[in-house]
Amino acid sequence: MNKYELVLIFKPELSEEDRNTVFSRIQQVIDENGKLEEVHDWGKRKLAYEINYIKEGYYYIVNFDLDPQFVKEIERRCRLFDQIIRYMVVRVDEQ
């Protein structure tokens, strides 16, 4: 298993309950196939640049261990939700 970091940016008009519902669907893949390390809710922040006329969003940073074959499934689920403006999964080097 490798260590990964997932950055999620949710639309600014979403309630905390809606964000948690969407995140739980992504977390399900991690829990079934790996281990969730940390979840950081950075709150509402201004975006570095406008995305589809949206200027701010809710940031989540998620650290987890997962087999590489399941990363595609996480990316697929992130693409399915309109509530997610942007996402990025990166492998973290172990030191």
Swiss-Prot record:
Entry keywords, A to Z: Ribonucleoprotein, Ribosomal protein, RNA-binding, rRNA-binding
UniProt entry tagged with the keyword Repeat: no
Keyword Cytoplasm in annotation: no
Any GO BP: translation
Domain of life: Bacteria
GO cellular component: cytoplasm; ribonucleoprotein complex; ribosome
SUPFAM superfamilies in UniProt: Ribosomal protein S6
GO molecular-function terms, A-Z: small ribosomal subunit rRNA binding; structural constituent of ribosome
PANTHER family: MITOCHONDRIAL 28S RIBOSOMAL PROTEIN S6 (PTHR21011), SMALL RIBOSOMAL SUBUNIT PROTEIN BS6M (PTHR21011:SF1)
Family note: Belongs to the bacterial ribosomal protein bS6 family.
Function text: Binds together with bS18 to 16S ribosomal RNA.
Name of the protein in question: Small ribosomal subunit protein bS6
Organism: Finegoldia magna (strain ATCC 29328 / DSM 20472 / WAL 2508) (Peptostreptococcus magnus)
